[in-house]
Amino acid sequence: MVGAEGEAIRQQAFTGRLPSDGFIDATLDDIHRRYRGLDDGEVADYIPILAEADPDWFGLSLIESAGTVHETGDADIAFSIQSISKAFVFALVCQARSTELVHERVGVNNTGLPFNSVMAIELNDGKPLNSMVNAGAIATTALMPGSTPAEKWENIRSGLSLFAGRQLSLDGRVYASEMEANQRNKALARLLESYERIITDPLDTVDIYTRQCSLSVTAHDLAVMGATLADGGINPVTRRRVVSAEIARDTLALLASCGMYENSGEWLFEIGLPAKSG
């Protein structure tokens, strides 16, 4: 459930009456103080190197569409973007190719299944259903323009950098660790190839997808990227348009319906905002 302070911000945002900078800063500080000692859950270990993350890291970053920054805690500590990259690659591919192509080749419906499931592919004639699950993200990455894998990768890296407002770089250790542990993604790509949902080399596509997930970001970067979508595709820091307002809207709609995987409905009911799990 949303706390009282968060609910106050949400209600003001929904009605167009934005809270003051001081109120936002005080609220973030209070949230950080209140929850920094929470130690439920475990550090992710499905990729070996992720298990090395410090569970005490906790940072909050909020950036307004005008570019005003509100931060507290470990907002400047770098980590790999992982599945959050899916939303922004979806937007970039829609901008470069067309939303209609992605809709036809991938889909926009929630699978109701775990993020790395093969069932959705098998049950829907090879259509992975949406770009937020692994199969759909791999199929979306395959649609990125580029005559070579290197060119496709650079288009993704540079595009995500435009969203972040700075040049993002690959975390080589994360990439190497993930490449050793992503047999399931390779299997998903092979299955998509068998249904002709991807026509590029499946292993090259998984390599590019793994690279995009291994880009190093901070909470600040993600706040800038999210604010770019919220402001209709315009980066609040650089003031540069990254994608059209229509594609920003479509991306937010997909995040609302599919961004939290099989729990997206519950998240939307309880929180009411687009989001993406990492």
Model-derived features: where do they sit?
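Active-site-adjacent helix/loop patches that line small-molecule binding or acyl-intermediate pockets
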Residues: 2-40, 93-209
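A short, well-structured edge-of-sheet supersecondary motif
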Residues: 36-72
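Short Gly/Pro-enriched turn/cap motifs at secondary-structure boundaries
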Residues: 50-53, 128-130, 180, 271-276
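Active-site SXXK
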Residues: 66-67, 80-103, 225
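Cytosolic covalent-transfer regions centered on His/Cys nucleophiles
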Residues: 78, 206-207, 213, 217, ...
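Active-site-proximal alpha-helical segments within enzyme catalytic domains
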Residues: 87, 216-234
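Conserved active-site-proximal loop/helix segments of enzymes involved in bacterial cell-wall
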Residues: 233-254
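Short, Gly/Ser/Thr-enriched beta-strand-loop segments that form substrate-interacting elements
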Residues: 255-278
